[in-house]
Amino acid sequence: MNIDWPCFGRTDFLNFFSERHDSVTLFSHADYELRKSDSFLAALYSVLENQQFDFCFSYNFFPLMATVCHKCNIKYISFVYDSPQVKLYSYTVTYPTNYIFLFDSSLVTQFQKEGLSRFYYMPLPVNADRIHSLLQKPYDSARLSADVSFVGSLYNENHNLYDSLQGISSYTKGYLDAIMQAQSHVYGYNFLEECLTPAITAELQNAAHYQKNPDGVESLSFIFSDYYLCRKLT
């Protein structure tokens, strides 16, 4: 079974399952991203109890789905393409029914060092056949060809959380700008979270009013470094 939501790669993965002659049941629910929903739990329980599945699959990890799969003793395979992904700090990642694949090998190592054995490394997949077929069609090669290209979001269009912070002191603003500037000159090591002192973190929390998830163990310093500073730095 595959949880159905408007994710990147949805069509490609469904084509992959079809080529393998796998029988796929799509499950969708408005509360799929929530951390608590009796409605989601009941709906998914009903599907899993009345049909037989080898495993459940989703792009990105969803704690509610992990909870139901654990309860029903069904393998839950998730491939996470969003980074950072705060849902990975839910206690539900510890369930033995999970198979969580990340494209960030250093993050896999980090989780495994903490004793979380349900994390595995896998590069981002691509549907080469579909891309090949697209290249057979006419396109503006001069405009769309390059030695190096970047496809993705710089987070300046949406989700620029850093610029939304209101009420932080000029000292804190200068401090944060300085550590981001320093980080921009360092490749291969992220030290931003280490630079967030308890006092700075408390001031950011007073400005952002971030509500921690009841099933999560993520620290405020992680939230502010990865979701606010790293996105701005990108």
Features from the language model and the residues they span:
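Nucleotide-sugar donor-binding catalytic core of glycosyltransferases
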Residues: 1-9, 117-118, 123-234
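N-terminal pre-catalytic "stem/leader" segment of glycosyltransferase-like enzymes
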Residues: 1-73, 222-228
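Short, structured coil segments at secondary-structure junctions
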Residues: 20, 72-73, 95-96, 114-117
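Short, charged, surface-exposed secondary-structure boundary motifs
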Residues: 35-37, 85-92, 110-114, 130-135
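Histidine-centered beta-alpha loop that forms part of the nucleotide-sugar donor binding/catalytic region
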Residues: 60-61, 80-83, 105, 123-126, ...
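Active-site proximal beta-strand in glycosyltransferases
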Residues: 69-84, 99-102
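A short, active-site helix/loop in glycosyltransferases that binds the activated sugar's phosphate group
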Residues: 100-117
